[in-house]
Design a protein with these regions (language model features):
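Active-site metal-binding core of divalent-cation-utilizing nuclease and nuclease-like domains
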Residues: 92-151
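Nucleic-acid nuclease catalytic cores
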Residues: 180-211
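Active-site-adjacent loop/helix micro-motif of nuclease/hydrolase catalytic cores
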Residues: 140-144, 163-175, 195-199
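A domain-level signal for the structural core that forms small-molecule/cofactor-binding pockets
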Residues: 116-117, 152, 156, 170-173, ...
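Charged, often low-complexity linker/regulatory segments
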Residues: 2-83
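Non-catalytic C-terminal interaction segments of nucleic acid-processing enzymes
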Residues: 206-238
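Catalytic core segments in nucleotide and nucleic-acid processing enzymes
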Residues: 133-141, 151-162, 173-178
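A non-catalytic, helix-rich entry segment at domain boundaries
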Residues: 66, 81-85, 90-92, 97, ...
């Protein structure tokens, strides 16, 4: 969810990412295309590409935290890195509609609507994932209507944030858990001084599988960098 020093979105505003042609179909699409079964070979290969792309982005931000001024630019760079992988390239047929689409998508609807506080009532509106990867086998089964409204359960999802702290990180974590994503990733980047760093890093320490997290924090005043790579059990000062 985009939420950095210059931008903020709540759940209602996220709905603006929904294309106009999807809104008229919401009440007509009642089923979703499920994610491929665990162990799917295509997904396993895609995971390798995704994790390598995230690691490259982390390395870039660790070395040069001001290459990108805002989070939108980081999203664009991540999409670029993902698209460099042959496994994730190309256009694939959407069932027998005669139309094709790509596998990497921005602002893909959440698999399951979240519950709103304080009533804990399920909100019919859905927020969006920052980046989602669909499998070709899913597109083969999806109707054009299911694709248009985003009713395809993405097996790989990435939430990327710049310059926010514990509350939003916890929200992104819960978003991924609520949608029961097969391969969920959090990318948490910061270059701001904050009294919330300790709380944020406690949340990071408590991230549980299947969610994986990559983290970089630049303490510009003290010229220190804290990093946690995907698969690493701890944050390492550099």
């Amino acid at each position: 969810m985009i939420n950095d020093e210059t931008q903020d979105k709540d759940l209602q505003e996220e709905q603006k990412a929904m294309p106009a042609d999807a809104k008229v179909l919401l009440d007509k699409v009642h089923t979703a295309v499920p994610a491929p079964p665990p162990g799917d070979e295509w997904v396993a290969e895609a995971v390798k590409a995704v994790e390598a792309s995230i690691t490259k982005l982390i390395d870039e931000f660790r070395a040069q935290p001001f290459i990108h001024r805002v989070e939108h630019s980081l999203h664009a760079r991540l999409m670029q890195l993902l698209s460099e992988w042959e496994h994730l390239r190309g256009w694939y047929p959407i069932d027998d509609s005669g139309f094709k689409t790509q596998l990497i998508h921005k602002e893909w609807p959440e698999t399951r609507p979240r519950k709103k506080e304080p009533e804990r009532i399920v909100d019919r509106r859905r927020g969006s994932f920052d980046v989602a990867i669909l499998a070709p086998s899913q597109l083969e089964k999806a109707t054009l209507e299911q694709f248009t409204v985003g009713r395809i359960d993405a097996p790989i999802v990435i939430e990327l944030g710049l310059g926010y702290w514990n509350d939003h990180l916890a929200s992104d974590r819960d978003k991924l858990k609520n949608s029961d994503v097969q391969h969920p990733y959090l990318v948490h980047l910061s270059r701001m001084p904050s009294g919330y760093q300790e709380k944020t890093e406690l949340i990071i320490a408590g991230i549980e599988a299947p969610t994986q997290i990559a983290y970089v924090h630049h303490n510009l005043e003290q010229k220190k960098v804290s990093v946690r790579y995907l698969g690493s059990p701890e944050i390492v000062p550099i």
